[in-house]
Swiss-Prot record:
SMART domains listed in its UniProt record: DWA (SM00523)
Organism taxonomic ancestry: Eukaryota, Metazoa, Chordata, Craniata, Vertebrata
Name of the encoding gene: Nfia
Domain of life: Eukaryota
Species assigned in the record: Rattus norvegicus (Rat)
Keywords, ordered alphabetically: Activator, DNA replication, DNA-binding, Methylation, Nucleus, Phosphoprotein, Transcription, Transcription regulation
Protein name per the record: Nuclear factor 1 A-type
Amino acid sequence: MYSPLCLTQDEFHPFIEALLPHVRAFAYTWFNLQARKRKYFKKHEKRMSKEEERAVKDELLSEKPEVKQKWASRLLAKLRKDIRPEYREDFVLTVTGKKPPCCVLSNPDQKGKMRRIDCLRQADKVWRLDLVMVILFKGIPLESTDGERLVKSPQCSNPGLCVQPHHIGVSVKELDLYLAYFVHAADSSQSESPSQPSDADIKDQPENGHLGFQDSFVTSGVFSVTELVRVSQTPIAAGTGPNFSLSDLESSSYYSMSPGAMRRSLPSTSSTSSTKRLKSVEDEMDSPGEEPFYTGQGRSPGSGSQSSGWHEVEPGMPSPTTLKKSEKSGFSSPSPSQTSSLGTAFTQHHRPVITGPRASPHATPSTLHFPTSPIIQQPGPYFSHPAIRYHPQETLKEFVQLVCPDAGQQAGQVGFLNPNGSSQGKVHNPFLPTPMLPPPPPPPMARPVPLPMPDTKPPTTSTEGGAASPTSPTYSTPSTSPANRFVSVGPRDPSFVNIPQQTQSWYLG
């Protein structure tokens, strides 16, 4: 795409990468033009003149492609949050033509109706979600008050919340048909087409000051018919920068699931990584009940056995063995063996790997590929995969190293801490056999458990020196697990020598 420095992590989501080539360039001009007209009216208490509106239109049409694409990326990120998580996959597949159209439900507002969003920053004009979809992906110039003109198709099962662009149509009334004939006839007469009625057939010459046929209609817009059709059919990514080509726009890394195509290099500083991870987590928490988009990749590493990628259950997806298929070939579902190998390939995405520009991806031959290439092949200082949100140096690993060091040093030895937190050394424990290794690390929360001490066996005391001796008394039993590291000592326990005579509890971490 254009310069990665202009994008944030949210603006580079695979959801956005897949849908951006299908956004019409007219949407940017139309939304901004309506906002400019509204601001002008509120400021000057009069409507914008034709000359001023035409100047604004020309300014918006000549805007840099980077600005248009950045706006479209932010708007797609908003729409993604407003679409229910279970329908986001269907939305991408249907808009990109990979799947027949199906209903895509959005999150309702407080009254259970279609939500409204502002398509621009610091704009007081709100648009219904279905209106936004029609303008964004079909390029139809609708006003924000044209929500009543939208008609859902008979195949739509939930017309109140469905935002599927293929299920949304625009009702055409008699006046629209009448004006369509007028515009068509007038436009054809200007092109001097002999097969169409001439201008004299539809326009009466004004007599005695009376208005003719065409004089009865006043066009309020600044777009001509041919210009409106042309700009409404142009994709927003048509005008691109040096790092963005139309050949790349025909595909998306949304369907190229190889680790090399999906990974981005990690940031150079951990502080930047932490900031972006926090921002991503906050954005994911905006929508109630929202889950990561990739069920097989956006979960925690421990839940990999409970979830599978949506490619495995999608009946319309090709099998991993028939990756490079022609457009005429049919779909086939993956076999069980292929599904297992596919899950193995998807497991590679759970590993946070630092890759450079020439790093070879750790992919298996069964990795799911589509006959497309990702939009961006250059790594940048950002994440594009929702699964890689944690730093490679996990705090859990450090906690394990702190609590359970090497087995050779800890076998049969347990550290002891004073109440003031200073360590007093280690001593061999006769009650813990040497070959017994400590179990896995304990959970983060452990309850204090009293340490049972036998009264019959003599305690192991330290040498002369008491508490200042480097070998302090330490007690344990084979039945005591390192998970129970809270020791409660009472005043009646004769096993400890240099302990104050009151009940104390501390943590032997």
